[in-house]
Structures are given as structure tokens and as C-alpha cells.
């Protein structure tokens, strides 16, 4: 795809997002504030013994999230271990214990890290009853937690922040399921396959034979993108023509990735009674996205060497049907959200180009971030920003009329610390423990030296931020990485949720402070700039040393 076509694709994505973010955001606000339950929802509530009018305190909401997720891990793990006895197993054996644990954790945490080749490892029953179900409910849990935090800002003098079961069921049945049905049909029309054909042996034009896998791909592809999940039906993910056959399906999948995350700030603004607040959050997200995408595109278009110059850019690892701009747009959207899907190989990017997806995740995936996690991550950074502004002018910080006291800033700070600790400690242990280091360097790392370090840093960054993309040169299906990355995914998902829900409970219990002439306006460009600055500075101070040892050093050496 040439440069003009790539630019037109970017413009079309932007136009569609501008058109849909308001109605979709308003729809979600009405959905989560509604007191009406459908007949199907009432039946589910009776079945599971839930009173939809009964709300939960933040500890009760948290316990429900953890219990539901634990059951999800056990179910997905069990399906994998029993695969040989399940229908539509395609003759595939049970998945090994370590890989089953890693995969179960991966899909329940919305990470979708895949240390295996899906078409050669998972039968259709595991794909549909296990992985696809988690694609829906893990996304719904993320949105529910974000809505709980929004209620914390919107409510006053109350001890409750909603009902997890109501939020979960509404998010699944009213939002994700109907949108996925529509988008799956569109993807089928675009050439994405949907069948139960299994493996087909066909004769090639050269006179040989080839085994071609089939499967119910479109139905899983829809929620994979819409729920910012990212796990592919095939090993090549969206670079595979059965998942993403054309340039327009690639653009459509980018829209799916960004639709809910960019619409949730509008939901936030509607629920707190000031849509300008949501617009400010969208402005921050959009600015960071544009800068990151532009930088990545420049690095790839200006790849050094004879081959990149002849091809008009670094085409290694990219599909000819997409080209550079469509590939960098997809890669930026995938790593600035929590999707992690790929239509090009990030490990084959230039040194500085490969650094950009890593930085996108290190920012905390807040521009716009995952379904729900992007909004609550950005609101945590907004709390940090008003605290910094309060220190500068000597006033007690407040945000949306809620006082940001010691408890609130401690919770926000703990949230910020979780993923850097997981990334840096996980990477350090991979090289500090002699037995682990020998295994990593001898078995897992394909490229030694600076890029080998980058591969390990990328893996832990992806796992801790629940992204799921990878530098594919790293062989991750080993006992160390299956366990270490599994733990990173668990802690990276649920520790932040603990702090977010605790913050929601603390804010909901407060009264609203009247606005005065000294109140910091959080809907104006000045606050947008402050929030962008805090986001970038926190990331730079935390990760610059390891980036200097990896991709920056590699880029300077190339």
C-alpha cells in the first residue's frame, strides 16, 4: 500500500471515531445508569441469586471481581487439560500444565498473551467455550471497574459503588454481544473465514500438498478487537489473511480496537454531569496517540539500509497488502490499547520503531487504553496531576469536587508503581538467577546482545500491562516464562483493580466541595497539557535506564 492510501486509511479511521464516540459514549452512560432490566437479565439474576437493586461496597465489589475471575481461570485451565476428551478437539492433545496456567491467566486478565501456536494447540471447543467467553467477560469486567470509579466521582456520601454482577451482565449482553454480532457479519463479508472445517489437505500449484486450517474465526475476531483482547485464532494473528484479509478489514479492526476506549471518556463526562471533563480526557488520549503513531511511522519509513531504502521504508515483517502506514497504525492502536494483536511483526521493526510499541505500553496503555482499564488508568493520572498542581500553588488538591487527600494520593501512587515493579523485577530476575539466565539465553532469546534484552523487557512489559503482544523472537513457552509472565499478568491486572476500587469507595464517601475562584479547571487546555506532561514524565523517569540499555543503544549502534 502506498503512502497516499495509508494516509487515507488513517483519515477514515479518525473520521469514524469522531462520528461514533459521542453516541456510543452516551449509550454506555444510559446503560450503566438505567434502572430497567430486560427479561433476559432478570432471568439471569434469578438464576445466580442476585438482587439487581442491591449495591455493593468497594470490598464486596472487589471480592466479586476476584471470585468471578478465579472461576474463569479454573474453567479455562480445566478445558485445556481435558481437551483430548472434548468434541471438536481436532485430534489435538491436552495442553501441558504450565502452558494451560499461562493461557488461562492470560485470557481471564484480558492479556491474551500466547506462548503457543493456536491452530496447532487449541481445538474449537477450547477456543469457543473457554477463550472466546473470556474475551467477552474480561472486557466487561474492565468496563465495570471503570464505571465503578466514575461512580466514585459522581456520587456523594455513599458507601456503595454499584453491583458487579449487574455491570458485568449489562456490559456483556447490551454492549459487547450485539456489537460483536454485527461486526462479525461485516468481517465475514470482508473475507474473514467462519467455519468448522478443521484441517484441509489441498494440492498446490507446484504439485505438492498443503494443510490449511479453518475455524470459526470471524466470530472470535470481532470480540478479540472490540474487547481489546488481541489473542489470535492463528499464530500470525491479524497478519494471517484468514483473520485480516484486506486493507479495509485492517482499518475496520483498528476502529474496533479504539471505539470503546475512546468513547468511555464521553461516558465519564455524562455520568459526572460535565461532558467537558470527558472531552479533556479524550484530548489527552488523542494527543499521545498521534505523537506516538507519527514517531513510529517516521522510524519505519526511514529505515536504514539498502533494502529499506529501495522499498521506501522498512518492510521486513510487514504484509505487502497493508504497507508501512497501515501496519504502524495497527501497531500503535494495538499497543496504546490493551489489545496486543498484530498485523506486522514488532520484532522486525527498526530498533527505534520497535521501541515505540514498548513505550506505548510503558505509558500504562492510557491513550486510549483497554476497555475500561484505559479510562481508569487515565483518571488515576488525573488524580496525580491535580495533586502536583496543588503542590505548585499551595492548595489542597481536588478533582471534580472531590478532595484528593493522603489516602487518595497513596492509592493512586500504589497504582502507578505496580507495573514498573513487575516489569523491572521480572526482567532483572530473568538475568540475575544463574539457572534462569542460562535457560533464557540458551533457549528463549533468538537474538543475543541488546535486542535480546529488548525481547525480555518487551515480554514483561506486555504481560504486566495486560497487552499480550510480543517480540516474536523470544521463545516464551518455557517453565520460567510460563510461570513468571503468568504471575506478572495476574498481579498486573488485579492489584491495580484493588487500588482503583478502593479509590472509588473513598471518593464516593466524600461530600462535594463547592467550586471557588481558586479551583483548578480540569477541562481546559492547561490541564490537558499538565496531564500529558505527568504521563510522559512518570514513564520517562521510570523506564529510561532500561530503554537506554536496550532499544536506544541498539538504535545508536545500527
From Swiss-Prot:
GO terms for molecular function: P-type potassium transmembrane transporter activity; potassium ion binding. Its main location: membrane. It is found in: Cell membrane. It holds the Pfam family KdpA. Part of the high-affinity ATP-driven potassium transport (or Kdp) system, which catalyzes the hydrolysis of ATP coupled with the electrogenic transport of potassium into the cytoplasm. This subunit binds the extracellular potassium ions and delivers the ions to the membrane domain of KdpB through an intramembrane tunnel. NCBIfam families: kdpA (TIGR00680). The keyword Ion transport applies. Belongs to the KdpA family. The system is composed of three essential subunits: KdpA, KdpB and KdpC. Keywords: Cell membrane, Ion transport, Membrane, Potassium, Potassium transport, Transmembrane, Transmembrane helix, Transport. It comes from Clavibacter michiganensis subsp. michiganensis (strain NCPPB 382). It is a multi-pass membrane protein. The keyword Transport applies. It comes from the Bacteria. The gene is kdpA. This is Potassium-transporting ATPase potassium-binding subunit. One of its GO terms (cellular component) is plasma membrane. The chain crosses the membrane at residues 1-21, 59-79, 85-105, 130-150, 179-199, 245-265, 279-299, 374-394, 416-436, 484-504, 527-547.
Amino acid at each position: 500500500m502506498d503512502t497516499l492510501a495509508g494516509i487515507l486509511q488513517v483519515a477514515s479511521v479518525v473520521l469514524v471515531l469522531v462520528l461514533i464516540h459521542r453516541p456510543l459514549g452516551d449509550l454506555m452512560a444510559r446503560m450503566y445508569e438505567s434502572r430497567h432490566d430486560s427479561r433476559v437479565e432478570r432471568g439471569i439474576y434469578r438464576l445466580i441469586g442476585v438482587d439487581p437493586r442491591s449495591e455493593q461496597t468497594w470490598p464486596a465489589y472487589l471480592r466479586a471481581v476476584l471470585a468471578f475471575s478465579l472461576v474463569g481461570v479454573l474453567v479455562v485451565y480445566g478445558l485445556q487439560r481435558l481437551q483430548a476428551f472434548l468434541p471438536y478437539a481436532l485430534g489435538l492433545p491436552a495442553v501441558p500444565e504450565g502452558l494451560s496456567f499461562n493461557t488461562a491467566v492470560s485470557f481471564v486478565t484480558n492479556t491474551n498473551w500466547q506462548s503457543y501456536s493456536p491452530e496447532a494447540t487449541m481445538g474449537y471447543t477450547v477456543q469457543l467455550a473457554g477463550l472466546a467467553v473470556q474475551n467477552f467477560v474480561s472486557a466487561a469486567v474492565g468496563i465495570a471497574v471503570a464505571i465503578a470509579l466514575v461512580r466514585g466521582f459522581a456520587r456523594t456520601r455513599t458507601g456503595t459503588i454499584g453491583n458487579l454482577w449487574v455491570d458485568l451482565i449489562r456490559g456483556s449482553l447490551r454492549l459487547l454481544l450485539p456489537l460483536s454480532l454485527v461486526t462479525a457479519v461485516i468481517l465475514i463479508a470482508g473475507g474473514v473465514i467462519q467455519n468448522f472445517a478443521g484441517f484441509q489437505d489441498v494440492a498446490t500449484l507446484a504439485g505438492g500438498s498443503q494443510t490449511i486450517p479453518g475455524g470459526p474465526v470471524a466470530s472470535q475476531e470481532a470480540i478479540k478487537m472490540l474487547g481489546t483482547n488481541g489473542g489470535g485464532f492463528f499464530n500470525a494473528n491479524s497478519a494471517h489473511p484468514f483473520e485480516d484479509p484486506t486493507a479495509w478489514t485492517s482499518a475496520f479492526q483498528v476502529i474496533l480496537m479504539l471505539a470503546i476506549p475512546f468513547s468511555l471518556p464521553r461516558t465519564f463526562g455524562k455520568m459526572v454531569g460535565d461532558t467537558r471533563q470527558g472531552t479533556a480526557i479524550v484530548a489527552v488520549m488523542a494527543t499521545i496517540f498521534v505523537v506516538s503513531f507519527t514517531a513510529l511511522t517516521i522510524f519505519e519509513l526511514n529505515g536504514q539500509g539498502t533494502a529499506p531504502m529501495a522499498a521506501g521504508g522498512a518492510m521486513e515483517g510487514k504484509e505487502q497488502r497493508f504497507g508501512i502506514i497501515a501496519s504502524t497504525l495497527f501497531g500503535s492502536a494495538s499497543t496504546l490499547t490493551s489489545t496486543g494483536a498484530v498485523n506486522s511483526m514488532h520484532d522486525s521493526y527498526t530498533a527505534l520503531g520497535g521501541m515505540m510499541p514498548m513505550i506505548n505500553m510503558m505509558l500504562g496503555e492510557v491513550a486510549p487504553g483497554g476497555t475500561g482499564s484505559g479510562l481508569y488508568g487515565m483518571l488515576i493520572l488525573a488524580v496525580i496531576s491535580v495533586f502536583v498542581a496543588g503542590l505548585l500553588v499551595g492548595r489542597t488538591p481536588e478533582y471534580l469536587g472531590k478532595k484528593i487527600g493522603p489516602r487518595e494520593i497513596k492509592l493512586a501512587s500504589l497504582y502507578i508503581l505496580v507495573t514498573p515493579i513487575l516489569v523491572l523485577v521480572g526482567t532483572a530476575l530473568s538475568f540475575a538467577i544463574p539457572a534462569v539466565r542460562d535457560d533464557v539465553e540458551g533457549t528463549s532469546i533468538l537474538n543475543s546482545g541488546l535486542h535480546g534484552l529488548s525481547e525480555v523487557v518487551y515480554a514483561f512489559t506486555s504481560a504486566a500491562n495486560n497487552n499480550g503482544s510480543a517480540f516474536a523472537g523470544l521463545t516464551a513457552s518455557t517453565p520460567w516464562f510460563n510461570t513468571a509472565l503468568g504471575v506478572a499478568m495476574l498481579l498486573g491486572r488485579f492489584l491495580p483493580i484493588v487500588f482503583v476500587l478502593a479509590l472509588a469507595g473513598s471518593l464516593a464517601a466524600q461530600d462535594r466541595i463547592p467550586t471557588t475562584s481558586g479551583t483548578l479547571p480540569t477541562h481546559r487546555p492547561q490541564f490537558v497539557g499538565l496531564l500529558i506532561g505527568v504521563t510522559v514524565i512518570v514513564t520517562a523517569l521510570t523506564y529510561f535506564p532500561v530503554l537506554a540499555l536496550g532499544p536506544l543503544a541498539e538504535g545508536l549502534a545500527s
